[in-house]
């Protein structure tokens, strides 16, 4: 299967008009002949600057530069006959060949991508335009099932060659909306479930993915390649998944927009699962508007994901989320809270000044910002950073995830064909059997320092939903929702004694304990790029709200984006970096 896909990919690249070097046969040319025919160049090679936006200039696309092109701009090119979807795919293929060998954001190309683009071009020529995503290329994290010539493996060799029964529901939705599936993105293997001490963005099948701003540092995860590929201009948008931070964190670290929806607003059906209580699917894009275009085609009830039934009566009556997009004038009179204790007080030293500067700009635009809108229960927020084992066993988020994962992965694998992997036990056995690649034991593979201790911890529970499990479910829900985000949003002004619900909580999304609270609650969050750290890596400002409050995140996320007009360009610092693990 892998060799077949390689040949398919090479065939598509040949069709793309790119020369494909062939391996020299040793039967016709000896090594000595090759050496003798070479001219020795004694000139010292001068390496290009490794910290510049000029290192990988975006290739021209029919004399147009698509760098940072939005969905609206791409549609404008196609509507006016300047570019076709096929042209745009060719251009992203050029960019893929230029930068992916360094940043490793895309795991696998779709061999049929040009065929799909051509079919959508034919539709456009015949007056059929499905919507704003018609002809727009995208990628999905390698834990979204795609029923095509690509493998869905969560980055693991254990599932290579397996056959999924169907497209994931949200992938099907995007295909029907006219989006062009370009490929699968790299990720942290098994979406960070397998190990507790690991190199973020690494998988056995995909290798180490890297942040295009600084290739030596942690690119965030587990939707690493999704964010990296958008930031590197290899694709228009991408899909990610999140159980705890896996959309917000990589989007923030790569200077793009990440929208994590309420659990149950977008389907998880056909996605390699972790926890039904916290898993969600969402877009990673260049702008809030682009993210909402994608989200608009993703959300909705899916009878195969019962959690999506919870959205009934809690979404816009007309089904339109695009109407909530706004500009900076919407900030006039808006009321935001700063949960200072634990969250803001743990903001990074090289981020806090810029974060507060942005808060001041928001105030100057007419918003009212209330400080110390804190959570009621602060004991569930670690001062030592992200920790899903915090608390006793009947209070821990990790208890819930470990039990859920054991059962959910078995259910998912029950429908996958052409594989001997049917359970968590099978995965653990595979990793032990192929130790040199999958690192089943600690300190065998540098990227998996703790081996597969996450899997072993889940295996130890065996999926048993006992009293301890249900106590943990209730505790996590109550402390993150009623005593957490909802408590902070329901504010009483000490000066006027007026009580009201805030329009959102502004948080430093670069602080892992912030997105962890939204993850535990199953509540929505958005992150916006606002600056870069001293090491050149981006960071962001987040907005959190209660369940089903995506309209608020869209309205004020787009308003703040319009106010700031901020965009950082990757400088590919140390673009030849090969360090593993990354920190």
UniProtKB/Swiss-Prot annotation:
Its EC number is 3.5.1.4. Keywords: Cytoplasm, Hydrolase, Signal. It catalyses: a monocarboxylic acid amide + H2O = a monocarboxylate + NH4(+). SUPFAM superfamilies: Amidase signature (AS) enzymes. GO terms for cellular component: cytosol. It is an enzyme of class 3 (hydrolase). This is Putative amidase C869.01. It comes from Schizosaccharomyces pombe (strain 972 / ATCC 24843) (Fission yeast). The lineage of its organism: Eukaryota, Fungi, Dikarya, Ascomycota, Taphrinomycotina.
